[in-house]
């Protein structure tokens, strides 16, 4: 236990010296589990993912179809609003920017924000420019393995910090677990926690 704490402190000093640890944050070598409500069951035969709202054509993919979309892999640091940070995490999944650039989805010029809709009606809002940035991913895998059920399997939104890149990086909670759809919107709208009084970041 003492050795693990020493390792954590040493690693924390390293990332702090590199300017990667924001003020008030502490490094964790674990991956804390934080969510509202029970973990939903996943059924691959009934699951689907929907793109809708301010798009030229609504899209709906089955689990097999979603896994056939172009894949991306990104290494990012993640920062939680509860003051822990985890570094050099490698996420794999589908980039919304790639979907747009390839014409698989066509976003209307009127779209300014995106609502992530998850199981149990949970919602998370983000500006469109964040969803289209390199540091946002519709993730299925973490560090080479499928994400676990308590971390959002089969699909979660992930937003993180890419060292050396000047990208808008909201806190990690702005990526929804158990994601089921993206709604492209002509204006911002509060998500679940914003309606409960949380800051819109």
Kindly give the residue locations of the regions a language model identified:
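Extended, aromatic/histidine-rich regions of cofactor-dependent oxidoreductases associated
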Residues: 1-50, 55, 60-63, 102-201
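Hydrophobic/aromatic pocket-lining and membrane-interface residues
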Residues: 51, 80, 96
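Solvent-exposed, acidic/flexible segments
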Residues: 89-93
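Second-shell loop/turn segments in exported
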Residues: 38, 78-88
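Flexible, low-complexity segments enriched for small/polar residues
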Residues: 58-82
């Amino acid at each position: 236990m003492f050795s693990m704490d020493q390792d954590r402190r040493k690693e924390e000093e390293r990332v702090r010296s590199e300017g990667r640890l924001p003020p008030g944050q502490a490094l964790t070598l674990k991956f804390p589990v934080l969510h509202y409500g029970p973990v939903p069951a996943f059924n691959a035969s009934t699951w689907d993912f929907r793109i809708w709202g301010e798009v030229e054509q609504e899209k709906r993919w089955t689990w097999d179809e979603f896994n056939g979309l172009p894949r991306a892999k990104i290494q990012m640091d993640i920062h939680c609003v509860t003051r822990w940070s985890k570094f050099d995490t490698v996420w794999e999944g589908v980039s919304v920017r790639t979907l747009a650039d390839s014409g698989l989805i066509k976003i209307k010029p009127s779209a300014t924000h995106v609502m992530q809709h998850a199981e149990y009606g949970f919602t998370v809002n983000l500006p469109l420019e964040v969803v289209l940035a390199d540091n946002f991913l519709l993730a299925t895998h973490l560090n080479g393995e499928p994400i676990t059920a308590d971390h959002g399997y089969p699909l979660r939104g992930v937003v993180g910090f890419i060292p050396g890149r000047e990208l808008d990086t909201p806190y990690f909670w702005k990526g929804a677990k158990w994601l089921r759809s993206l709604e492209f919107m002509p204006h911002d709208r509060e998500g679940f926690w914003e309606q409960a009084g949380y800051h819109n970041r």
